[in-house]
Amino acid sequence: MSTFRDDTGSHGASSNLTGHAVLDDHHMKVGTISDVVYDDAGTPRWAVVNPGPLRSEKFVPVEGAYMTESGELVIPYGKEQVKHAPKAPRDHILDSRTEIVLEDHYEVRHSN
């Protein structure tokens, strides 16, 4: 296992992360990473997860997540918690109000 990290320093989709499977805290597949949201310092803060056809994409915090040797991102949240998170907008832009709602939903706080 390795710590979740991305060295691109960019904002938006990262070829190093997009397309990787996301597993919940019981190693059940939640979906696939379609985009990554970075903070101003270039640190990844949120993964946009596509759960599959006919389902809405969701933001998932990367804090506490890790990459397996086989390349899956394991998050410390259950599939149901992700399922009930607010939908990610189509443009994947995360405004401050939505981020607060997401932090409450996942019970995380990011330092600014």
Feature locations, PLM:
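Peripheral interaction segments used for macromolecular assembly
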Residues: 1-112
